[in-house]
Amino acid sequence: MDIENNLQDLKRKFNYIERKLENPTNLSQKEFINLSKEYSELRPIIKIINEYDTLKKEILDLEEIIKDENSEYDIKELAKEEFFEKQKVLLPQVKAKLKLALLPKDEDDSRNAILEIRAGTGGEEAALFAAMLFRMYQKYAERRNWKFEPISISSTGIGGYKEASALINGTEVFARLKFESGVHRVQRVPETESSGRLHTSAATVAILPEVEEVDFKIEEKDLRIDVYRSSGPGGQSVNTTDSAVRVTHLPTEMVVIQQDEKSQHKNKAKALKVLRARLYEIERQKKEIERSTMRKSQIGSGDRSERIRTYNFPQSRITDHRINLTSHQLEQIIKEGELDEFIEVLISRNEAERLAGES
């Protein structure tokens, strides 16, 4: 089908939705929510289409001036300059923006996200690094006015985290954080190291889209739920009631333990939320592999075994190995969560890969 017809169809659809939303009393709550979502998704695309249409009209008008034998010489020359800039420079730029805007969206991009961090190789130093990463993402969430809600933290007693998870709520959380999944490596001299020897440790980060029960249902028969008394560092009991919950998904043998809340009901709800996100992510990855068999994405795999970034403290340097980007602002990134330098490039690179795959 002609691309021009597609663009005009989109404009007509947008205008139709706009008219509908002008009289919300005629809509059910579900219709209003769905139309509002579609309207907000279409609005940036329509803005580019309007820009494209305006530019094409301006180019045609300039063509008329250039062809008109009655046009004065100076006006013709100015028109030729403007025509060249708009035809050869601006139009290709707007076309590229339009092509990108029309690419199929990742349906999970608008979702909230569950952050999971696990200490890897490196013992206590790895646990301290995991805690540092957890705080870094918390700072980044604050910078973007997202809500950062810790779900579960398994600490080592001296400030490190063996495991930690959090729910992050806000606008396009998953879209911006999904490329953070993978192995993060740190190189630094531990405070306890008397010889000053450089240690290398690692932590694994997983970013999972949050899914509601209506979006992804888990069969009750596939679950085993055990309750017990919660324990603190070293195994000592910190609760006199059976509030800790262990949920096992029998088909996959996946286990989620939640004991941070005093209420068994709240712990169960949180554990099920994490389990649902993990199972959904497995299905999502299967679909992504099917979609990308024809093209090998360098940054979009989200493979948790892939080493994606190294934090070198002696040189105050952070390197993202997927995009060969190095920053010497380690302090600001770690302590203030200034991650956008990396995230923006990762998003742009992914968009370029998707465009190449469509062409």
Curated annotation (Swiss-Prot):
Pfam families tied to this protein: PCRF, RF-1
Post-translational changes noted in the entry: Methylated by PrmC. Methylation increases the termination efficiency of RF1.
Q: Which cysteines are joined by disulfide bonds?
A: none
User: Which molecular function terms from Gene Ontology are attached?
Assistant: translation release factor activity, codon specific
Q: Where in the cell is it found?
A: Cytoplasm
User: Entry's InterPro entries?
Assistant: PCRF, Pep_chain_release_fac_I, Pep_chain_release_fac_I_sf, Prokaryotic/Mito_RF, RF-1
Keyword Protein biosynthesis assigned to the entry: answer is yes
List the SMART domains hit by this protein, alphabetically.
PCRF
> What are the entry keywords?
Cytoplasm, Methylation, Protein biosynthesis
- Superkingdom of source: Bacteria
Q: What is the name listed in the Swiss-Prot or TrEMBL entry for this protein?
A: Peptide chain release factor 1
